[in-house]
């Protein structure tokens, strides 16, 4: 979607929010909004179903009541097993990136990394993890079963356009499963 068309939709949406009869609720379903600057935009109540938000700038944007955004809580529940301690996730090491020297890759070890908090960034800094089947389908190396403890959930980021991966800032390594 080009910037002019997007600007027109947002202006009309603003009128709709103000109960102006000339306004129309923004329907951005399926729109390609990659790299769009939506900073400060009021998209409250907009339909964003299946809109591509990868790398879109949403700082200070109002997304309250927006439809179609991926719920992080629902995604975690649907794709990861729960235990009494937290969520079970899976990870590989050394395939794409060399692990930081301060990470001890051994059972019981807890690793930490600053996670990019931007949900519009599909693959960002942090400890990237995924469901077992996703990891197994992508990598032919050892797969670690890991735990994200309940108290560490504030450091978890589920990108709006995830291809299966999520990222976190703290993780406990449990065991190699493959």
Where are these regions (language model features)?
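Generic structural microfeature
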Residues: 4-8, 103, 125
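C-terminal accessory domains/tails appended to large, multi-domain proteins
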Residues: 174-178
């Amino acid at each position: 979607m080009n910037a002019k068309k997007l600007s027109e939709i947002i202006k009309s949406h603003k009128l709709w929010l103000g109960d102006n009869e000339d306004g129309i609720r923004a329907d951005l379903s399926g729109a390609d909004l990659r790299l769009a600057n939506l900073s400060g935009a009021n998209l409250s109540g907009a339909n964003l179903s299946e809109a591509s938000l990868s790398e879109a700038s949403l700082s200070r944007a109002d997304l309250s009541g927006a439809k179609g955004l991926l719920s992080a809580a629902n995604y975690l529940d649907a794709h990861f097993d729960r235990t009494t301690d937290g969520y079970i996730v899976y990870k590989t090491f050394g395939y794409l990136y060399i692990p930081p020297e301060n990470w001890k890759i051994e059972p019981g070890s807890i690793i930490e990394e600053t996670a990019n908090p931007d949900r519009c960034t599909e693959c960002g800094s942090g400890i990237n993890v995924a469901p077992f089947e996703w990891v197994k389908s992508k990598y032919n190396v050892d797969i670690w079963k890991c735990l994200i403890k309940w108290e560490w959930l504030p450091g978890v980021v589920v990108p709006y356009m995830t291809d299966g991966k999520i990222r976190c800032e703290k993780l406990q390594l449990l065991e190699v499963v493959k």
